[in-house]
Amino acid sequence: MITLDLILPDTRYPIHIGHGLLEQVDLLLPHLPLPKAAIVSNATVAPLYLQRLQQALEARGVACSSVVLPDGEQHKDWQTLNLIFDALLSGNAERKTTLIALGGGVIGDMTGFAAACYQRGAPFIQIPTTLLAQVDSSVGGKTAINHPLGKNMIGAFYQPKAVIADMELLATLPDRELSAGLAEVIKYGLLGDAGFLAWLEANMAKLRARDGDALQYAVKRSCEMKAAIVAEDEKENGVRALLNLGHTFGHAIEAGMGYGAWLHGEAVAAGMVLAAAASAELGWIGRDEAERVRRLIAAAGLPVKAPSMPTEQWLNLMSHDKKVEAGTVRFVLLRELGQAVIKSGLDTALLDKILRENS
C-alpha cells in the first residue's frame, strides 16, 4: 500500500492506494469521530461491495446505515441529493455521523456535497470505485450537483477525511468506464509531466488490460500531481484551474448532449483533442504534437471527435462554465506537451475551424 498526504492550511488527510483495502477497517476508524457511519452508494456498485464494507465496519462496532441511489450522471441533481438527506434525517444521523462515498465520481460529488450541507458539516470519507474517481474527483474536495444549464454549478469545497483507492474494485469496472478514467490520467501527463505522458504511451496496453502494477502507478502519479496542485490552490483561484484541461469543451459536450449520454471522461477526452487543436492553431505546439495527443486518446479507447453542434451552441454552453471571468470564457490549452496554460477567449474563426475539423 502507498499512502500520500494532502496537506492544506486547515486540514490534512491520507490517500491510501493499494490492493484489497476495502475491508481494511483500520484505515477508516481513525477518521470516525463516532462509531456511526452512513454509506452512500448506487444501484450498480451496492450489490458488489456494499455488504462487504458494511459487515466489516459492523464487526468493529460501527453502526452502519446505507442509502442506494440510482446510477448515472443524469441523477446528479437536487432530487437525488434529497434522497441522501431523507435517509440521514429519518435515521437520526448526527453531525458526527461519517458519510462514506462508495462509488464513482457522481456518488463522491453528491456525498461530499451532502456532508458539507448536513447540519452545516458532517465528516465524510471517499472510497472511489472507478478509475476516474480514484485519480481525480475523490481528491481535492470539490463537491457538487449539476444544473440543466451547467455541470457542477451548485456545490462547495469540502475536503474528505480520507481517500481509500482499492485497485481490486476496478476489476468489475466496465471497459468503457475504465477508458473514461484513463482520460483524466492522460490529462495529468499533458498538463504537467511530459515523462508521465511518455510512460502512458508506452504502457497504455497494460492499463487497458488492467495490469495491477501499471494501474497502481497511474493512480499514484495522478494523485501526487492532483495533491500538489490542490495544496497550492485549494479554492481554484489560480493554478488549480489547469486541472480543467479539456473540461471547458467537455462540460459543453455533456450539457449539450444531455447528462449521461457521454461519460465525463469521454467528453474530457474529446475536449482535450480540441484543446490540442486550438494550441496548434495558435502555434504553441506543433501539429505533430496535436496528433500525438489524438493518438494517445484513441489508444485509450476514447472518442477523438466531438459531437456536431453549431458554434453558437458551443459558445452558449461554454458561457456557463465556472472558469468564465468578466463574461469571457477561459480555456486551458497547451503551451507544450507537459505544460498547460490558461487562455482568455478564443477567436470565433479559430473555434469554427477546430470544431469543423474535430467534430
Curated annotation (Swiss-Prot):
Top EC category: lyase
Co-factor requirement: NAD(+); Co(2+); Zn(2+)
Keywords: Amino-acid biosynthesis, Aromatic amino acid biosynthesis, Cobalt, Cytoplasm, Lyase, Metal-binding, NAD, Nucleotide-binding, Zinc
Chain residues that bind NAD(+): 71-76, 105-109, 129-130, 142, 151
Catalytic reaction annotation: 7-phospho-2-dehydro-3-deoxy-D-arabino-heptonate = 3-dehydroquinate + phosphate
Example of a GO biological process term: amino acid biosynthetic process
Role of this protein: Catalyzes the conversion of 3-deoxy-D-arabino-heptulosonate 7-phosphate (DAHP) to dehydroquinate (DHQ).
Pathway where this protein functions: Metabolic intermediate biosynthesis; chorismate biosynthesis; chorismate from D-erythrose 4-phosphate and phosphoenolpyruvate: step 2/7
Primary localisation category: cytoplasm
HAMAP family found in the cross-reference section: DHQ_synthase (MF_00110)
Gene name as annotated: aroB
Stated name of the protein: 3-dehydroquinate synthase
